[in-house]
């Protein structure tokens, strides 16, 4: 005898009618059990020698919100240069090899900009978006979220030294 098809909506209604009731406001909007949110934004270009463009660099603010036990702070803000991201990637690859996690692949960073217009607003914003996507990809990996000391230091330490 064929079973009657029930759409998801009718199944949901039958569950709710069996004493489960409507979910409360706090259940709907409660903090997730474990979360890690990372944003790379607010790029700033620095001219260390006053008006001389030699030595100019751009850094980016990384904001992290988390309740994961491997992190020491629930909210952290740090500023990082592109070279810091490069060093972080190298340290992360080394940590992964030492922990023998062959299935963790660290993606490549967005390409280094060698053009003379690397400090234009459009180029800086394109890089920021690339670094944001890259950082979310790396931080979104479950093994790295729960076990990477290098990731925690990069996100939380005022100065990243590996």
Swiss-Prot record:
Signal peptide: none annotated. It holds the Pfam family PX. SMART domains: PX. Keywords: Cytoplasm, Golgi apparatus, Lipid-binding, Membrane, Protein transport, Transport. SUPFAM superfamilies: PX domain (SSF64268). It is a peripheral membrane protein. GO terms for biological process: endocytic recycling; late endosome to Golgi transport; protein localization; protein transport. Transmembrane segments: none annotated. Residues 1-23 are annotated as: Disordered. Disruption phenotype: Abnormal retrograde transport to the Golgi apparatus with proteins missorted to the vacuole. Sensitive to neomycin and trifluoperazine; sensitivity is suppressed by knockout of ANY1. Monomer. Interacts with RBD2, YIF1, YIP1 and YIP5. This is Sorting nexin-3.
